[in-house]
Regions:
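A boundary/linker detector
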Residues: 1-3, 14
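Short amphipathic
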Residues: 4-10
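Rieske [2Fe-2S] iron-sulfur-binding domain
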Residues: 14-101
Length: 101
């Protein structure tokens, strides 16, 4: 059974940015887009780059290692339509951000 785990507080992630967090033994990339929070696997499927450290453009993140781009609302790769990273459900509890793992 999956549980929601607190990974950050709202004020820790500015709009248009991301952050690497840990939950349930997994590294997760957490993003803020217009006050909405999204969570995907932190690992780029291309060569394992840290997505949470990438540049954010709209609802996309660019892997800092080799430039692969993902829509963090769906996990879908912009570069390869057959490729997707895992997405995690996010909910807010006051100012706490929780991710389901």
């Amino acid at each position: 059974m999956a549980d929601f785990v607190k990974v950050a507080r709202r004020g820790e992630i500015a709009d248009g940015t991301g952050k690497v967090v840990e939950a349930g033994g997994r590294k997760i990339a957490l993003f803020n887009s217009g006050g909405n929070f999204y969570a995907i696997s932190n690992t780029c499927v291309h060569q394992g780059g840290p997505l949470g450290e990438g540049d954010v453009y709209g609802t996309c993140v660019v892997c800092p290692w080799h430039g692969w781009e993902y829509d963090f609302t769906t996990g879908q790769s912009v570069d390869d339509p057959m490729t997707k990273v895992a997405c995690y459900s996010v909910k807010l509890d006051g100012d706490d951000i929780l991710v389901e793992v």
